[in-house]
Amino acid sequence: MDFSKTIIRRLAPAAAALVVFFVVSAAYFAPQFRGEVLPQHDVVQYEGMAKDISDMRAATGEDPQWTGGMFGGMPAFLINVAYPAQIVKRTVGQVVKLIDTPAAFLFFAMTAMWLMLLVFGVDPWVGIVPALAYGRSTYFLLIIGAGHITKMWALVYAPLMMGGAWMTLRGNMWAGGALTALTASLEIGANHPQITYYFLLAMSAFWISEGIAAFREKHLGDFWKRTAVLAAAGILAAGSNFSPLWYTASHSKETMRGGSELASTSETSQDGLTLDYATAWSYGRTESLNLLIPDFMGRESATTFSPDGEVAAVLNEYGLRGAAQQLPAYWGSQPYTGGPTYLGAATIFLAALGIALARGRNKWWIVAVSVLMLLLAWGRNLMWFTELAFDLLPGYNKFRTVSMALVVVQWAVPLLGALALMRLWRGEIPRQRLLRALAWAAGVTGGLCLLLAVAGSAFFDFGRAESTGMMTEQFRQLFEANNMQDYLQRGMDAEMGIATGNAMAAERASMMQADAWRSLLMILLAAGGVALFALRRINKYVLTALLAAVMLLDLVPVDLRFISHDNFISARQHQVTATAADKAIMADKEPGFRVFNLTVSPFQDATTSYFHRSVGGYHGAKLARYQDLIDRYLSYRNDAVLDMLNTRYLIVPGDGGQPEAVLRPTANGAAWFVDTIAVAGSPQQEIDLLGETDLKRTAVIAEKDKPYTQGWTASPADTAAVRTIALTEYRPNYLKYEYTAPAESVAVFSEIFYPYGWTAYVDGAEAPCFRADYVLRAMRLPAGQHTVEWKFRAPGWTAAEAVTLVSSLVILLGAAAAIVYWIRQKRKENNPDE
């Protein structure tokens, strides 16, 4: 009986936590359990990116490892490649599929944070509160709505990885090593290197903190031993993902992330992403206040002004009814934002309490890493620091959207709160000290909210100057377009611009003030609960329940501003459907041609790839040379370059705005023979020559590829003779051509050249190939009637998969050994006489 009670008592908090997390997640995403779907931009884009890959996999069981569907063709390593040897991901990683997404995202994020807190020594009841704060933080809802799936899974696994590092350096070294290897394997396998990178920086801060403590306490030997175990766990975790890491690393050199061979372009430099491109999405220093007050900066880019607010009242006087709903309430500096990274006012209050109460060794590394990540997130708004990070942090210049660094702050702030709650739970804080700390934490956080609610307009102009300038210019253009010169002469454009700008600033200030009062209320509720506990009016269980309720009351209503039940649609509505233009193009059975869709942003949209081989696409790591081609020619619809890419159709807006297919009869075809060779002395000259050369007759090649055509010339008789080459079979990773040529000839293939994995064959025998026309493939072909084949397979595949498999098996065996050891230890504790 006593044994049963003990088991129930031990399992009760775990059961309660899981039930709370499931109910909170399932209730929020209830429509998914009715079969409805949340439309997510990046999910739709991904379906287009991977369409020809998944089609081939379904039809043949073969993984192509290459897509021909977008940007003319590119490796699939950063899109969708099957790695059978990733058995940690394919076994333990399948646990997250017990619940469907999107509810699974929140449930497992909260569960992972809760489990990490257990490792950190936090009581399981206490851990529910910071786990709710982590899983319900608004940024999660923003990325779920956008469809950033890999990012979300990386944020699910990251706390578990941090827990493993904590256990390795502070607890059972071997169990910690096994846990770190397992969870880091899952984290890396989530395939979002930027999130993993940020959390490795956080882990480094913890490691440095532990090293300093070991030096002071004179136990460096033990510290280095634990460090070795942690490093070994990291090596195994990387090894269990060796295949994707290897191919991603080798592929990255050819992408925008590896830099351009040209002088710096708009997005790439010769070493990586340009600083301007990488920092385009930088969090504003002032904007950081929306971590505490959600609508401080006007919410999201799509938020407009109220139809019955101050802006509408001003514009209605000018006869511009409805115009207020077209003007942006957001006044930050980011080019686009889906909303604030709101952490929760109550969460920040608890973090402040943690700073006041937690022991130094436990808190200062967390505070330090939070400050570091906030500074990194500021990007171009603190350029000297960002340049320092670009120069000193290895690999940092490969990432864009530096504001993403706030994900670590989102994790660290609830952790600080957990440290405070744990000291309260254990009764370690004298009442007077607790009340002083409570007053300080509430005074700092609540006082800031109160100050902004009462006098925010004294500190900020809420975008008044920028809005006034923007509206003055718009009114000027309106008057000029309607030949209203008298209005311009009277300065009405400036007068109306000032009035509208003032109204926009005033309405934004009202939004901020409303949320400042709201945040103050949440802080007072949380502080009130802690005060009641300090005065012994409630016990620790009631305090935990009260704070959990405050977390939900604080975060869920803000989350609902971005995703609610109304956002869900039927599964049928979510399907990508072919337009009449798509159907007309698909009726053309000529293999291998491409489509350039001008009814969408062609280089930021992959839906075209759902039905066609697209000139455009959607990807953050395009091949660097193709990005150069976009910057120099494709953005300007250069016909010669579109022809060499075998662009047979344009999709353009037709009558009534409906997409219409337009045939381009000038496309070069899937392959063609050239008469002459133009040799370029540099990559810059290569791309320049594309705009100066008849690419139907001449191939542009680099100086280093000159030996491939050495001694070849096409005689007048050769060029006058009938030469034919045609694509007869196409799959993403296999192309077959039949050709006839009376003499040795050079053929250019309208397929993207990639130096790793593609092999060319003539009549079954391997044959040399080289790059032509900056991005395409070319071959020197023998006279006669022959067959050319191109086959793609990732180089070194067998060896890479072997490393992945062995590392994965070692991790799983280590995890199993740790579990067996733990069970035996528990048996000894319960039965010491055995």
Feature annotation, model-predicted:
Residues 3, 131, 147-157, 168-185, ...:
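Contiguous transmembrane helix-bundle modules in multi-pass membrane proteins
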Residues 99-113, 338-354, 409-418, 518-527:
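Hydrophobic alpha-helical transmembrane segments
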Residues 117-136, 171-177:
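Transmembrane-helix signature of polytopic, membrane-embedded enzymes
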Residues 22-113, 120, 132-155, 269-345, ...:
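Membrane-interface coil-to-helix junctions
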Residues 260-264, 555-720, 736, 742:
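Extracytoplasmic
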Residues 349, 375, 648, 657, ...:
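Active-site-proximal, structured, solvent-exposed surfaces of multi-pass membrane proteins
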